[in-house]
């Protein structure tokens, strides 16, 4: 996937990366170090803020749908003139999250790329223009689209 990100960075002017995950913020250091060591482009990280000593810990087990919608909407609102390629996987709620965001922001969502990790059914992408999305297995599947 690193090659996909690097090719996007080279291909698109003012390309920026925003990693949104329902993982806890406590993983930030490990995630950012991994991406840096592997040579990924710089990015912002949007992770769940939880604390063990209060009720925010329960958010760790909450459905990621609302969290991801909220985080990505903040980014879309902050950069209303940018076009976005949403990249996720079929393992959790990414297809549903991205479809909802596409419905709300069709002019900003340029592409939706979903790594198919569990033989996902294409019907999950119902309502999205077929030219706007695709399932993929490896990053090399996307290289020709960039």
Give residue ranges: language-model regions.
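Short, acidic loop-to-helix structural element flanking the phosphoryl-transfer center
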Residues: 1-17, 25-29, 66
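Short, surface-exposed connector motifs at secondary-structure boundaries
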Residues: 10-18, 77-84
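C-terminal cap/substrate-recognition subdomain and adjoining C-terminal extension
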Residues: 23-146
């Amino acid at each position: 996937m690193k090659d996909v990100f690097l090719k996007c960075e080279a291909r698109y002017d003012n390309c920026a990366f925003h990693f949104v995950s329902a993982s806890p913020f406590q993983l930030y250091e490990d995630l950012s170090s991994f991406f840096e060591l592997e040579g990924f482009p710089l990015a912002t990280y949007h992770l769940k803020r939880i604390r063990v000593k209060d009720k925010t810990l329960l958010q760790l087990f909450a459905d990621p749908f609302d969290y991801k919608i909220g985080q990505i909407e903040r980014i879309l609102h902050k950069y209303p003139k940018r076009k976005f390629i949403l990249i996720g996987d079929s393992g959790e709620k990414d297809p549903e999250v991205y479809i909802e965001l596409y419905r709300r922001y069709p002019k900003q969502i340029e592409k939706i790329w979903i790594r198919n990790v569990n033989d996902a059914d294409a019907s999950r992408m119902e309502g999205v223009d077929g030219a706007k999305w695709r399932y993929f297995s490896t990053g090399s599947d996307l290289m020709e689209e960039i």
